[in-house]
Amino acid sequence: KKRHEMPPHIYAIADTAYRSMLQDREDQSILCTGESGAGKTENTKKVIQYLAVVASSHKGKKDSSITQGPSFAYGELEKQLLQANPILEAFGNAKTVKNDNSSRFGKFIRINFDVTGYIVGANIETYLLEKSRAIRHARDERTFHIFYYLIAGAKEKMRNDLLLESFNSYTFLSNGFVPIPAAQDDEMFQETLEAMSIMGFSEEEQLAILKVVSSVLQLGNIVFKKERNTDQASMPDNTAAQKVCHLVGINVTDFTRAILTPRIKVGRDVVQKAQTKEQADFAIEALAKATYERLFRWILSRVNKALDKTHRQGASFLGILDIAGFEIFEVNSFEQLCINYTNEKLQQLFNHTMFILEQEEYQREGIEWNFIDFGLDLQPCIELIERPNNPPGVLALLDEECWFPKATDKSFVEKLCSEQGNHPKFQKPKQLKDKTEFSIIHYAGKVDYNASAWLTKNMDPLNDNVTSLLNASSDKFVADLWKDVDRIVGLDQMAKMTESSLPSASKTKKGMFRTVGQLYKEQLGKLMTTLRNTTPNFVRCIIPNHEKRSGKLDAFLVLEQLRCNGVLEGIRICRQGFPNRIVFQEFRQRYEILAANAIPKGFMDGKQACILMIKALELDPNLYRIGQSKIFFRTGVLAHLEEERDLKITDVIMAFQAMCRGYLARKAFTKRQQQLTASKVIQRNCAAYLKLRNWQWWRLFTKVKPLDEEMEAKQNLERHVSTLNIQLSDSKKKLQDLASTIEVMEEGKKRLQKEMEGLGQQYEEKAAAYDKLEKTKNRLQQELDDLVVDLDNQRQLVSNLEKKQKKFDQLLAEEKNISSKYADERDRAEAEAREKETKALSLARALEEALEAKEELERTNKMLKAEMEDLVSSKDDVGKNVHELEKSKRALETQMEEMRTQLEELEDELQATEDAKLRLEVNMQALKGQFERDLQARDEQNEEKRRQLQRQLHEYETELEDERKQRALAAAAKKKLEGDLKDLELQADSAVKGREEAIKQLRKLQAQMKDFQRELDDARASRDEIFATSKENEKKAKSLEAELMQLQEDLAAAERARKQADLEKEELAEELASSLSGRNTLQDEKRRLEARIAQLEEELEEEQGNMEAMSDRVRKATLQAEQLSNELVTERSAAQKNESARQQLERQNKELRSKLQEVEGAVKAKLKSTVAALEAKIVQLEEQIEQEAREKQAATKLLKQKDKKLKEVLLQVEDERKMVEQYKEQAEKGNTKVKQLKRQLEEAEEESQRINANRRKLQRELDEATESNEAMGREVNALKSKLRRGNEASFVPSRRAGGRRVIENTDGSEEEMDARDSDFNGTKASE
C-alpha cells in the first residue's frame, strides 16, 4: 500500500516531521496532547525511538547493549537519549486512578540535528512537577515510583546505608505498598540504576540521590506534639530527625531548634519564635516538597548536561511536547489552573494553525472564500488568566495578594470577583460550599476552582533557618542542591505578611524572589514562542475508556474529546476547503505525464502550464482552485491524480520492458548464429590438422625450427657483451674528466663567496651612514613641529580665557536671578506659615470645646450612676426596669470609654500639630536668617571677584601682546629652518639614488652567483650519474664475459643455454630500468639494448643448433663497440662545451668585479662630498637649534608664568562654581523643607478635619445619650411615685429577694447583654 492509504501511525508523523526538517530546513515540533492515560508519554517514547534509529550516526556499527530489534544499533548519544525517559519516569511518574504510569510533570524534549540529519544533542525542559504528591496522595494511588523502587530493590548493604524500612513504616506512603500490574518494582530499580550509569551518573552521585530520596521519606516520620499549657510544639522522639540529619549531613540539635524555635528578623532585631504544632508540620512538609523538587531539577540538569556534551553544531531541531491535558476534578486547585491555562494556549496555537492560517492563505492566494468563524477564539479566557492590568487577571491578582498585608485566599477571591465579575468567561458559583470558590469557562467546559491555600502555593514559603543549615551541609551534594537559598521566602517575610505596617508590600522590589505563577507564565511564554517559530505537528491522544480495559470504546467519551480539542472542526474545514496544495512547478513536473501533449514546446509560465494541464485532465471546476503561486485541491483529488499517474507510469514501464526484452532476444539470436559459424570453422581446422600430423616432413620442420632461434639468440648476446665493454671504458674516462672540472668550479665558487662578503660589509657601512642622516633630518623636523604646536597652544589658551570671562559674566547674572527667586520663595513660605498658625488656633479652640463636652458627659455619667444605685436598692417589682437600666448603663459606659479614647487621641494629635507648628516656626526663622546672610556674603564675594577678574584681564592683554611679538620671531625662524630642511632633503635624495644604484649592482652579482651555483650543482649531478652508469657497465661486462665462456664451452646444451639467456635478459632489463635517470644518450642506448634483447630472443629460437653463428655474434659485438666509441666522442665534446661555458662565466665574473669596484669608488667619492656638506650644514643647524632652544626656554618661562596665573583663575572659577552649587543645594534644601512644611500643614489640616468629624460624631452621641438620660429620668420619677404608694411593711424582705434576683438575672444574661452591646456598637459604627 501507499503511504496515504495507510492508517495514521506515530512513526509516519515522526518521519514526516523529520523529512520536512531536512528538506525545508525549518524547525519542527510534535505536540502530544490529551487526557491523562491517553498515551502521550508512550507516543513520545515511540517518536524518540524512531528518531534514534533513523537519525543515528552509528548505523553501521553493532551494539548489543541496547537494541530494539535484530537490526537496530545506536551510538552513545542515542542510547543516552533513550535512557533519559526511564530516569525521568522513575522520579516524575506515579500511579493514579486513570493511569498506572501517569506523568506528573510536563516536558519539552528538544532534539538537535546537524545539516546531514544526524542527532548531535538534546535538551529537556520540564513544567509543573506535582511535588505535593511526595507527601500525600489519594486512595488507591501511589507517590512517585522511585520511593517504591528504592524500598523494593535496594540490597542489604544499601538498606543499611540509607536507613530504609518497610513500606508501612513511612507516613508519606499512606497507602502502603500498592502494586502495579505487569511491573516489578525491584526490576525497575535495577533498570533505573543502569539508565543512570549509561547517562554518566557516577556511583557516588547515584548514592547521593538515593540518600536524598530516603531523607524525604524520613521527614514524614517526624512527629510533633502540642505541650500541655501552651500552644508550642515539641518533638518527644527525635529518632526520625536523627536519621534525616545523618542522611543530609547536618547537626540534629540545630535542625530541631530551626524547626521548633526558628530565628526571625523583626526590624533590625533577630528573635526566636516558638512554633505551634501546625506550623511545625507545615514546615516539615514544605521542606520535603522543596527537597524533592530540587532533586528532580538537579537530575534534569545532569541529564541535559550528558545530552549536550557534543561539540557539533546543530543546524535545526525537532521538539516533542508531552504535557498534561485538560483536567476537571471534583476539587480543582492552583495546579489545575496552570495546566488548563497551558492547554488553552496550546489549543489556541492549534486553532490558529488549522483555521486562521489556513483561511488566511486562501485569501492571500486570491481564492474565492467566505471566512468561516468556527467559534474557537480562546483569547478572552487566556486574558482572564494572564492579563497584567486594566483589569488584572487571575495570576496578576494572585501575585498582588501575595504581597498585600493581611491578605487571605478569601480576600483574593473577593477582589477577583470585583475585578472580573462581568467577564463572560468568569462565573461565581450559585451554591457556594466555600467562600474561596470561583468558576472559569474553558474551551472544554466550565471548571470550578477552589482557591484554598493558593497564596501559600504561589509564594512557596520555606523555613529559611533549615535551608541555611542545608546550604552549609557537610554533604557536597546536599549543599549543591540548596545553593540558591537567597531566593527563598523565609519566615520573616511570611511574618511581615500579617503586619499592617507594610505600606509597600504590594510592590515587588528589585532582587526579591519571583512567585510560582510569574515563573510559570514566563516559562510558558518561552515555550509558546519556540512552538510558534516551528512547524507544528499535532498528535491528539484519545482515551477510549476510563476503566483501563482494552478493546472497549466509549463513543460518547471519544466524541467529547474530539469536540474539545478541535478535531471535528478540523475535519469540517478539510471537507469545505482545499487542504491539498502544490506549487505550480512541482505540479507540472509531477503530473505532466498525464497531459503530455497539452503543453507546447518552448518556455511557458508555470501558472499557464498548470491551467492547460487541468483543462486536458478535464477536472471538475469545483474540485480545484488556482492561486497566485499554488494550485489547491479538495480532499482526494491529488490521491486520484496520483493513482492515474501510477497507472500511466506502469504502462510506460511495461512498454519499455517489452522493448528491452525484444532487444535482448535479438542479441541472443545473433550471438547464437556467430557461435554456429565458429564451430564449423573449428571442425574444418581439426580435420586439416589430423591429415598433417602423420606427415614426416612436418615432424622434421617442427624439430629444426627451435634450434635456429636459439643460435640467433646466442649471437645477439655476444654482440651485446662487446658493446657493453666499450661503454664501460668510455664511462671511466668521462668520470675522470668531470671530477677535475668540478674541483676547478668549487675553487671559483669559494673565491666568489669571499668577494660577496666584502661587498656586503661595504653595503652595510653605507646604509648606516644613510640612516644617521635620516635620523638627523627627522629630529630637526620634530623640533620644528613642536614649536608650531606650542604656538597653537598659546593661541588656544588666550581664546579659552576670553570664553571663561564671558561664562563668568553669565554666572553672575544667573546668581542675581536665583537670589531674587529665593526672596520670593521666602515671602511665600512666611505667608503659608501665618495661614497654618490660624489653622492651629482654630484646632485648639475645637479641642477646648471637645474637652468641655467631655466634662459635661462625665458629670452626667456620675449622676446616672447615683440614680442607678438608688434604683437597685428599690423594690423587687421594679427588677425588670432596673435590668434594662443596667443595660443602658453599660452601653453608656462603653460610649464613655470610646469617647475618652477619642479625646486622648485628639489631645495627642493636637500636641503633635503644636510641635509641628513650633518646628515650622524655628525652621522658617533659621532659613530666613541663613538666606539673608548668604545673599549678603555672595554679593560681597561677587564684587571682589569682578574686580580681580578685571585686573587679570588687563594683565592677560599685555601678555597677549608680548606673545604676538614672540610668535612673529618664531615664524621667521620657522621659515629659515624650512629652507635649510629642503637643502638637506635634496642632499639626502642624491645619497639615496647612489645607494639604490649600488644595491642594483649587488643584486646582479648575487643573481650571477646563483647561476654559477646552479651550473655547479648540475655538473655534480652529471658526475654522479656517470659514476653510477660506469659501475653498472662494469658489472654487466663481467657478467657477459662469464656467459660468453660458458656458451663457447657448452654449445650442445641448447635448452640450458636458452634458459640462461632468459635469466641474463631479465637481469639486463632490470639494470637498464635502473638507469632511467641517466642522460639522454644513455636512455637512447637503453631503448636500443631492449630492441636488441628482443632480437636476440628471436634469433636464439630460430638458429638453435647452428654452430656457425658464433662468428656472426663476434662481428656484431665489434660493430656495437664502434657505436659506443662514437657515443663516447660525443660525450667528450659535450664536456669540452661545458668547460668553455665555465671559462666564459669566469671572465664575466671578473668584468663584473671591475665594474663593482668602479661603482664603489664613485659612490665613495659622492658620499664623502655629501657627508662633508652635511656635516657643515649640521654644525650650522646646531647653532641655530641652540639659539632656538634659548628662545624656547624664554618662551617656556613665560608659558609657566601664564600657566600659574591661569591655574589661579581656574581655581577661582572653580570656587565660584562650588559656591554656586552650594547655593543651589541650599535652595533645593529650602524647597524640600518648604515642601515638607506644606505636607505637614496638609496633614495637620486633614487631622483637624478628622477631629471635627469625630467631634460632630461625639456631639451626636452626646445628644442621644442626653435624650436617653431624660427618658430614664422620667422612668425613675414614675418608679419613685409608685414606691411611695407601696406597702412599707413588706419592703425590706422583698427588696433583698429582688436584689438577689437582679444579681442572678444579671449574671445569667451577661452573654446576652454582651451580644446586645456588640449589636449596639455595630449599629453605631454603621451610622
From Swiss-Prot:
Actin-binding: region residues? 524-546, 625-639
Q: Which residues form a coiled coil?
A: 707-1289
PROSITE patterns, per the entry = IQ (PS50096), MYOSIN_MOTOR (PS51456)
User: Is Phosphoprotein found in the keyword set?
Assistant: yes
IQ domain residues are 649-678
Q: Where do the Myosin motor domain residues begin and end?
A: 1-646
Principal place where this protein is found?
other
Q: Could you tell me where the Polar residues compositional bias lies?
A: 1127-1143
Q: Which Pfam families match?
A: Myosin_head, Myosin_tail_1
Q: Where is this region: C-terminal?
A: 1290-1327
The Swiss-Prot or TrEMBL note on domains reads:
The rodlike tail sequence is highly repetitive, showing cycles of a 28-residue repeat pattern composed of 4 heptapeptides, characteristic for alpha-helical coiled coils.
Name of the protein described by the UniProt record: Myosin-11
Q: Which organism is it from?
A: Rattus norvegicus (Rat)
Encoded by which gene?
A: Myh11
